[in-house]
Structures are given as structure tokens and as C-alpha cells.
């Protein structure tokens, strides 16, 4: 079994989603993959990976709004009976940094995807 390592870099502009499908497809083509497992890892501590559909832009809009509602920027309400508001202590890297760390903890920093061509699936 052959293993190939490739490193991809993406420029980001703060909170949001980046569709990396095209870049992953180029990497697969460049390395002549036809079947195997594609392991993806984010090396950044406030970035994560998700797999979602790309047909309806409302999916990403809804995901962003939901994440903003459960992980607000400045403070959060405790889940206790009295719903105390707590401010984040970690803010040295910007107001969006602590919420980004929390969102990363709630999602994935690694994904594995089955990769095969229609020819490989027929074997």
C-alpha cells in the first residue's frame, strides 16, 4: 500500500467557510489516486473541517448563524438554573479567537474520506 503526503495552504479572511473541493480534486488528480482513504487534517488551532452539500448556499448561511448563536463573540450564558453571563478571559489574539477555539472543539480537525473512481468501485 502506497502513502502520499501533500500539504495544501489556504488564505482565510476571518470567520467563514472555504470550499476546498476543487483543491482536493486537483491533489487527487496530480497524485493519480484511483482508490484509497484521504485523510485531512487542519494544523491550525482555530480552524476545523466539515463535509456539507454545496448545492444550496443556505446550508452554509444556516450553519454560520447556528454557530454564532451557540458560540457568541463576547460572552456566554451558563447552563445552570440562574443563567449567569460569563465573559471570555482569552482575548489577546482578537475578539473572534476564543469563539473560534470553541467552534473547533465542537467540530472536526481531522476527516477521513473514502476515495474511489467508478472503475475502482467495479473491481
What are these regions (language model features)?
Residues 2-12:
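Short amphipathic
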Residues 8-10, 40, 49, 104, ...:
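Preference for bulky hydrophobic residues occupying beta-strand positions
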Residues 16-63:
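Active-site beta-strand/loop microenvironment that shapes enzyme catalytic pockets
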Residues 50-52, 56-91:
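Helix-adjacent hinge/juxtasegments
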Residues 74-115:
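Mid-chain, well-packed structural core segment of small domains
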Residues 116-121:
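Conserved small/polar residues in nucleotide/adenosyl-binding loops
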Amino acid at each position: 500500500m502506497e502513502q502520499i503526503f501533500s500539504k495544501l495552504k489556504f488564505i482565510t479572511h476571518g470567520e467563514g467557510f472555504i470550499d476546498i473541493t476543487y483543491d482536493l480534486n486537483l491533489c487527487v488528480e496530480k497524485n493519480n489516486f484511483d482508490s484509497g482513504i484521504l485523510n485531512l487534517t487542519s494544523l491550525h488551532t482555530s480552524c476545523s473541517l466539515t463535509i456539507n452539500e454545496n448545492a444550496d448556499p443556505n446550508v452554509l448561511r444556516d450553519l454560520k448563524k447556528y454557530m454564532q448563536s451557540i458560540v457568541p463573540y463576547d460572552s456566554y450564558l451558563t447552563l445552570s438554573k440562574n443563567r449567569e453571563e460569563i465573559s471570555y478571559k482569552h482575548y489577546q489574539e482578537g475578539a473572534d479567537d476564543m469563539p473560534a477555539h470553541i467552534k473547533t472543539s465542537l467540530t472536526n480537525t481531522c476527516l477521513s474520506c473514502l476515495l474511489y473512481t467508478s472503475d475502482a468501485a467495479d473491481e
